[in-house]
């Protein structure tokens, strides 16, 4: 019993040390990447696509930070689900009066037996005017007005996908600290593997890819029956070490 009582803490300590070294290595890799990555100089026109559901308050809070990005030519397309208890349409109409680059449409109630998120993204892509598509979500807000410029510096001629960093906003409370830490570790693993040349997933809160890549893959046809997968499964299918770049600035 004494040996067991000694062995368990020792094993836990070794495991903790291994995990710590692993994550410190990931952090170092991300830091070095941010200091040494080669940047593109073009600012191609962009289409930002969001799909909203019961998100009127989130759009009212976060959409201005997206629409007021310091970037020469971009459009914002919001596709929302019709809902009797949501004011998305009113919020978007109000913003459209101020921002001429905002476009919006809705997913009809008759759309059934298909993921509304994937349908909304598909509608947004078909409505878009530009080759480069940037994706985020209504409950997300860029950390500055340079978000699009930082993403666009990765849009080189041999790049099809850009995976961006995202995390939760820090507020008081144990639960927020825990989920923020977990999301940080997840992002480090995801982006770290991509930097190594082995991208395997993406996060719909902050990523970009070419419209032509979407059509070449025939959209989400291979997993259309699944409710999710519009970001992680799609990126897993199309991302390669040679066509994917990473942006670590939020």
Residue ranges of each PLM-predicted region?
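Acidic donor-binding loop at a coil-to-helix junction in glycosyltransferase catalytic cores
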Residues: 226-233
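N-terminal membrane-anchoring/stem segments of glycan-assembly enzymes
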Residues: 1-41, 189, 193
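Catalytic beta-strand/loop signature of glycosyltransferases that borders the donor
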Residues: 165, 245-250
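Cell-envelope/extracellular polymer assembly enzymes that use nucleotide-activated donors
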Residues: 44-47, 75
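Long helical/loop segments within the catalytic core of UDP-sugar-dependent glycosyltransferases
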Residues: 96-126, 130, 150-217, 221
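Acidic donor-binding segment of Leloir-type glycosyltransferases
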Residues: 63-111
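Short beta-strand-to-loop acidic/aromatic patch adjacent to the donor-nucleotide binding site
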Residues: 130-141
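Donor nucleotide-sugar binding loop of glycosyltransferases
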Residues: 55-58, 84
């Amino acid at each position: 019993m004494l040996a067991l009582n000694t062995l368990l803490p020792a094993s836990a300590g070794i495991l903790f040390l291994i995990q710590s070294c692993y994550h410190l290595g990931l952090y170092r890799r991300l830091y070095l990447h941010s200091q040494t990555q080669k940047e593109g100089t073009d600012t191609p026109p962009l289409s930002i696509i969001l799909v909203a559901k019961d998100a009127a308050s989130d759009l009212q809070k976060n959409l201005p930070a997206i629409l007021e990005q310091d970037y020469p030519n971009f459009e914002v397309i919001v596709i929302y689900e019709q809902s009797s208890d949501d004011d998305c349409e009113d919020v978007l109409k109000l913003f459209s009066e101020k921002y001429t680059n905002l476009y919006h449409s809705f997913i009809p109630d008759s759309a059934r037996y298909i993921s509304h998120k994937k349908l909304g993204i598909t509608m947004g892509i078909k409505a878009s005017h530009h080759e480069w598509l940037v994706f985020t979500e209504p409950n997300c807000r860029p950390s500055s007005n340079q978000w699009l410029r930082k993403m666009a510096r990765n849009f080189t001629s041999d790049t099809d996908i850009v995976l961006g960093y995202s995390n939760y906003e820090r507020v008081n409370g144990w639960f927020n600290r825990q989920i923020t830490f977990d999301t940080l570790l997840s992002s480090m693993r995801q982006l770290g593997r991509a930097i190594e040349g082995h991208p395997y997933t993406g996060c719909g809160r902050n990523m970009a890819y070419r419209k032509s890549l979407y059509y070449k893959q025939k959209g989400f046809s291979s997993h259309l029956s699944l409710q999710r997968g519009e970001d992680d499964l799609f990126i897993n299918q199309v991302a390669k070490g040679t066509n994917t770049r990473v942006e670590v600035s939020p």
